[in-house]
Each structure stands twice: as C-alpha cells, then as structure tokens.
Amino acid sequence: MKQFIVFILSLYTTLSWAVLEVTIFKQEENTFPIVISDFFVVGDASQGKVIADIMRNNFNRSGEFSVVNANYIIRSKPSFDKWKAKKIEAIVLGKLEKISKKIFNVEIELLDVYSKKTLYKDIFTVHNSGIRRIAHYLSDQIYHALLGKRGFFNTRLAYITVINKDKGEREYRLEISDSDAQNPQTILKSREPLLSPVWSPKQDKIAYVSFKNSRSEVFIQYPFIRRKIQKLPYFDGIASSPSWHPNGEILLLTLSKNGNKDIYSYQLSSKKLTRLTIDMGIDTEASYSPDGNKIIFTSNRSGQVQVYIKDLKTNKINRATFKGRYNAQAVFSPDGKSLIMVHKIDQDYRIALLDIATKDLKVMTNNQLDESPFFSPNGDMIIFATNQGGFGVLSVVSIWGRQIFELTSKVGEVREPNWSHYLK
C-alpha cells in the first residue's frame, strides 16, 4: 500500500560549513554483508542516488554491516547465485519516480540472497524536503527486517559547539543534526556558556542550560515551530541538569534554592515544583527511568561521588555503584536494565556500562576525559564527548565495546551530545 510521508522541517538554516565530519572505524569481524543498489530513476532526478548513498552510509555507520555497492542499478530479480558466491546475504533494490517538480514515489525491496525471498517491500510518496528522512526511515525498516530489532537512523542529535573568537572570546552554539551528523542547524548562538541540551520524548523541544543572565538557568527551545523560547522560573540559586519525564510534561532539575543542590521535578503546565531528594550532600545529574517510576542521580552523600537510584513510588533510595571512587552522569538504557556513566580509573575519566541486576561494570573506552554519555534509542550505541589532542569531539561506541565512529567539527569543539527518541 502506498503511503504519503510528511516530514517536519526546521525553521533554522542549514550551514554546510557546520557539518560535523564523520570518521567511521572499519569493523572487520561479525558484520552482515549487504548490497545496496543505486536506485532506478524514472524522470530527471538525482534523489535516487541521494537515498542510496544515505542508506549505505547508515549501514556502514551501524558497525553491524559491511556494505557493498553493486556499481550498477539492479532493476529486477538479481542473480542470487552470483551474489551468494561473493558471500552477500541480502540485497536492497530501489526505484524513484518523479511525479511532479517536488513529489516522488519511492519504492524499496529487500531480498534474502539464500532463500530468494522478499523480506521487506513498500512504496511511499514523498516531498523533496523529505528525501533524507525517507532514507533514514527505510534504513530503519531494513535494519529491523534483517536483525529483528529497531535501528537508530531516523533520529536526531543535539550538541553544543564552542568556537574561539577574537580577543579570547567564545561563541556557544546549540545545534541539531540528523543521526548521521548531516543536515546541521544552529538553533541558538550565545556569548555565554550553553550546557546540557536534551530532547523531549516527542522531539518537539529541547531543554538546555544557559548563563545568558549571568546565572545558570533552564530554557526550552522549539526547533520546528515559531514559538518564543520558554524560560523556566528563577528558583533562587543554581538551576541545572534538565531531564525529561517520558510523558514530556515534567522536567527533572538540580536546584540550589535551599542552599544545597538537590533534585526537583517541575511540572510545566501547573508550574508545580516538587523536591525529590533531601540530603546534606550534593545531589545532581538526575534522569528518569524509561517507565518514569524511578530516577537516577549523582551524589557525594557517601563521601564519594556515586550513582543512586530512587523509587518514586516507595521513595526508597539505593546506591547503584560500588566499583571505584567516582561514578557520575548516569542515564538509563532504553530497556531500563543498564546504566551508562562516567567512571574514573586512576586519573582517567572513561565511559562504563553497568548491569543494574548483576552490578557488573564494563569499561567501554580507553580515553582520558570522557563525559556526557547517552544511549541511542535502540540501546545499541552510546554517544559521548571526549578530548582528542586537546580538542573536544564526539565519539560513538557500541554496547559491545567497539568504537564505531567519531564526530568532529572544522570550526570548533563539540560537546554535550544528546540523542533523540524515534521520530514520529
């Protein structure tokens, strides 16, 4: 059945020089060999090649596939024996038909080389502005058909770029991009620091911290509609570390309104503020579990910097980390079974994965200054900020510990990454 796909456009300008450079680290073992053919195009259009190229890049970037370009257009049933001899396991065929100046039909078919069966097939009508989005969407569908789990391609990133200006000044930019770091848009520029951008569950807004009024305050930005930036009330003292409830209506905040940093929840519609932790220590960096029934936060209440979990139904607080003297910036995995965090080893800050049930802690990186880890929405990837040669970059590893790709900027340092949920 043909589907018509409508995609939301950002109100902000895409700047080619702001595109992050993606360095993919080759994966030699246990990858799935797949052919993605150039699309057969009906009418004068270059969009067929664009879709195929985006899809190839997506699968190469996944760390789970080795992608082969057929170097020619496969229009119908391919020679399965030929591809089987090359140890190819699946083939993607595509067709793009130009309906009008900016409207296209996009057909896709995924074939299993060994069974010779169609694993996925569909047709869509799409506007020219949605070409990139349909390529990501189709990548997710094929990923699921082959591996039985959701992909992460039809998602977005948010991050902060820091640019050194003349006379020692700096410019801070809140930026967003597609998951492949393409289609970047600068949402906000500031001479004062910007921190902690975090997508709402519906991907319609971003909460972040700004020092524009010479103090740490939380704001909400709407990238895709014309709406004024929303500033949360001034709560006295510091406001930091925003994090969304799964319903998108509540924010977790770190506030020092009573002289000490504690965790609060703030209901956006009712403006109700609720204190969730009361301790003489510093409580900060809180985030919700996927079901919204628990929060995780960093605290020095034990005399060390450790991670704690609070059950919001029972109000019981349990310490989650015991290995090492410093564990911080933890977030739940999408299935709620694991935590990703910053773990200190000697003088190095690295990314570590904790199994909540078994308490098994696995160090994922071998860097010196890792920070701000966050899961991809399918839970298979972890994006984080790190330092390479004194320069801030973003890096992505799989939950199996393989470095997949790195994101760098030509114009400045990149920090504070956040990965959106799935786009609707």
UniProtKB/Swiss-Prot annotation:
Keywords: Cell cycle, Cell division, Periplasm, Signal. It is found in: Periplasm. Its main location: periplasm. It holds the Pfam family PD40. Residues 1-20 form the signal peptide. One of its GO terms (biological process) is protein import. GO terms for cellular component: periplasmic space. Gene3D superfamilies: TolB, C-terminal domain, TolB, N-terminal domain. Part of the Tol-Pal system, which plays a role in outer membrane invagination during cell division and is important for maintaining outer membrane integrity. Belongs to the TolB family. The Tol-Pal system is composed of five core proteins: the inner membrane proteins TolA, TolQ and TolR, the periplasmic protein TolB and the outer membrane protein Pal. They form a network linking the inner and outer membranes and the peptidoglycan layer. This is Tol-Pal system protein TolB. It comes from Vesicomyosocius okutanii subsp. Calyptogena okutanii (strain HA). The gene is tolB.
